Amino acid sequence: MGGQGGRTLRTRVYVDGYNFYYGCLKGSRFKWLNLHALFENQILPSILHMGPGRSPDRHELLPVAVKYFTATIVETAAKGPDSVSSQDAYHTALENYCAGRLQIIKGYFSVSQVRAPKVDHANPSKWPRHCERVEIWKFEEKQSDVQLALHAYHDALTGDVDQVVIASNDTDLAPALQMIRDNTNVVVGLVNPTCDHRRPPNTSLVQLSHWTREHISERELAAAQLPRVVPRKRGVSLKPTSWYARPDLLTPALILATKVRGSKGAAFKWLSTPNEHLRGAVPLDLLESDEGAAAVITYMEDWIAKHPKSGNME
């Protein structure tokens, strides 16, 4: 842990998957995220924490650098028709691309029918106990936050780490951080998983941390994306079409490009290559806006009309 010019801290990152998703990724084009690269190349190099000798600490990620706590989506409660398959593709891609540097630890979802008080819209201030009770579906993520807390505390207590980095804004983790502070000399870092400067980290977590990263930028998320195609033992994991910035614009362009190029892989290769006929822009980037998509579609339709039998769209 010692050394000239500051300590070298054996570091592990603990990611609260759903807290991270809802804080940083929901509705964004950054869901196909390489969590290991995000922390290794973006987050940790930005952290300046002074050790006892008033020299900056160095962050050295352990071989298992990231523990990612999540739960498999229940199909009956999924919000999208491809939610289950997309999550599975992402988890498989993470495990294969990060090759042992990232561990996925899963809890589970509980889906049950319960009775709960209904808000009285005629009198919103009416106490819940006085409101009508109705039957509802209750969705609960189970064990993820408990497992994160236990893993972080275990790793700190057994001397596996010199620094734990918690990527969550869930105050349920405060007792675990308190125990780490009370019973070990391990450094506690906090990363608030939000891109919104107006959503500050919870005070109770900040007070228990040696340092805090208050937000993650979109630039950092963009710089830490997995490749569109990730090889696995049998086959590949593909970034879901619905995880791009504008799937509604990408889908028709992909259909046209596949028609000409012959396969979806070849179509994506064309869409990912700067095109001189589109002023050097990458078609895939243009498909993030209505105006850009119109330019791409118009170009492809014109090209197809002029070259009906060719598969080598320029």
Placement of each model-derived feature along the sequence:
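Alpha-helix C-cap/termination motif
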Residues: 6-7, 97, 155-159, 183, ...
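A generic secondary-structure signal
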Residues: 45-49, 93, 151-155, 179, ...
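Amphipathic alpha-helical interface surfaces
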Residues: 90, 148, 152, 173-176, ...
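Nuclease catalytic cores that cleave nucleic-acid phosphodiester bonds
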Residues: 109-245
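Domain-level signal for Mg2+-assisted phosphodiester chemistry and nucleotide/NA-binding surfaces
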Residues: 1-124, 133-137, 187-189, 194
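Non-transmembrane "mature" sequence context
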Residues: 237-314
